[in-house]
Amino acid sequence: MKKIIFYSYLKCSTCRKAAKWLKSKDFEFQLIDIVKEPPLVNYINLALEQYSDDKKKIFNTRGKAFKTLNLNINCLSSEEIIQLLLSDGKLIKRPFLIYERKKVILGFNEIEYAKQIIQV
């Protein structure tokens, strides 16, 4: 069985769509509220590795929490990014899905989910 950890925000319609898609494909997943329990440091590090060319993709740039900080992500170190993301789960792009503890998938795109999860 494929191990999926799914960090979600209950009020997020994109998260609900992604969860519905996973259920429709009969995937079991561990659901975690990203606001109450942000992703573990090792998962944030994994996301930083995967998105090293554009670290801004890890952030929920449309959210109020991000906009109020007025950040220049390119000027932040990886450690500063980690501390920021751990401090407020609403800063993190969601859903934040960890697949087999080796891959992070940010946001929801049905084609990307199928490509990354089903066809692996």
Give the ranges of each region predicted by the language model.
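Thiol/selenol-based redox catalytic cores and closely related redox-interacting motifs
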Residues: 36-120
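Local sequence-structure signature of Cys/Sec-based thiol-disulfide redox active-site neighborhoods
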Residues: 1-25, 29-34
